[in-house]
Amino acid sequence: FEGIESLKAQIVDVMDDMKMEASHGNVIVMGSENFGRKGLAIDIVKAIQTMDSTFSGKVAKISGEALNKKNIPMTLQKLRNGALIVENAGGLTPITVNAITESLQNEVDYILVVFEGEKETLEPLLNGCVETKSVFDARIVIDDFSNSDLVAYAKGYARELEYSIDDMGTLALYNKIGDMQTIDHVVTVDEVIEIVDNA
């Protein structure tokens, strides 16, 4: 997310706030799936694996709907000293969210839980329980990217590959993204990566 300053600032804040202590420092990644939400959730877990020496357990991914059917305390105990990524966490029921919150506050010492999902489905769940907000206090909101954001992302991605995009390339990139962007189609980060890879 090189070049998208508002998102980079949120990521830096989350890196400071997230902790393996179960009762706080858990992460929420909200936004459209088209803009790298799942990849960012995975990258956050990879980052804490390298940063925190208490991280020694397993990493698991599960959908919100599937987690509703699990025994929450037992599931979290199995992942102690590890991480759980809940994909499409908006599919969680309020009962499951409360069970996760209670388990993180009382039953598990060290774990990182990452909720990722659409803002429209996650916010109502989080607003329903004050304790959940204090347990999941590291938050990233990925807003829809403008063409300028996508161009900045492309330039950052190119830099990671040790390439640069000159002024003519930047103009061509704006034109390409503008042509692809329609009322029915939102250009995704993956499409921007493909443009750079094909250049």
Q: Model-found features: residue ranges?
A:
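Pre-Walker A (pre-P-loop) alpha-helix and adjacent loop at the N terminus of AAA/AAA+ ATPase modules
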Residues: 1-26
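Conserved alpha-helical scaffold flanking the Walker A/P-loop in AAA+ ATPase domains
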Residues: 15-19, 66-106
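Walker A/P-loop
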Residues: 24-57, 136
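Conserved nucleotide-binding/hydrolysis micro-motifs of P-loop NTPases
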Residues: 34-35, 66-68, 90-92, 118-123, ...
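AAA+/P-loop NTPase substrate/partner-engagement loops
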Residues: 47-79
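Structural recognition of the conserved hydrophobic beta-strand(s) that form the central parallel beta-sheet
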Residues: 85-87, 110-120
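A short helix-turn-beta junction within AAA+ P-loop NTPase domains corresponding to the substrate/partner-engaging
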Residues: 109-110, 127-148
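Conserved AAA+ ATPase small/helical "lid" subdomain
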Residues: 144-146, 150-199
